[in-house]
């Protein structure tokens, strides 16, 4: 989060309940787990889809897993804040009860520019205070960068598709 640029950058998404400062605080909790002497335990139990709803009272591995899922996997959620991690397609392909994370009501990051990726099927998304820059390099499409020290200016280059192994 760069307050002077009014910009928050995340890999995937931010739950509607988190503001930029809380997002950074929670990301640091995961960073500490990765740097800590129990990092192997954290990584061993990292992958999972529960808990799927934020609560400030979450603790331990459940808390770290939820934070990690939001910041690295989140694409969709429900109006009550439940994650929809199974869906990976572009908006419109998901079940009707799910919304893109950035369209959920009450989003506490709505007043800052959020730059995110991890959604190749979405493609380039430019809205007021929202910039999705995953343009599908992994699929042989484009790699996109953005200049943030002013109005968002994007730059894209063609990628080569990596053969399946």
Residue ranges of model-derived segments:
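Feature recognizes metal-dependent phosphohydrolase scaffolds
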Residues: 1-165
């Amino acid at each position: 989060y760069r307050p002077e640029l009014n910009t928050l950058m995340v890999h995937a998404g931010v739950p509607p309940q988190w503001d930029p400062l809380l997002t950074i605080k929670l990301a640091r909790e995961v960073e500490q787990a990765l740097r800590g002497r129990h990092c192997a335990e954290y990584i061993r139990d990292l992958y999972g889809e529960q808990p799927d709803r934020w609560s400030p009272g979450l603790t331990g591995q459940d808390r770290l897993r939820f934070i990690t899922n939001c910041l690295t996997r989140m694409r969709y959620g429900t109006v009550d804040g439940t994650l929809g991690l199974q869906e990976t397609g572009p908006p419109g392909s998901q079940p009707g009860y799910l919304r893109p994370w950035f369209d959920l009501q009450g989003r506490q990051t709505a007043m800052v520019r959020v730059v995110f990726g991890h959604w190749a099927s979405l493609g380039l998304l430019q809205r007021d205070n929202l910039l999705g820059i995953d343009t599908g390099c992994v699929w042989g499409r484009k790699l996109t960068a953005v200049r943030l020290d002013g109005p968002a200016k994007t730059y894209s280059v063609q990628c080569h598709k990596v053969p399946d192994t």
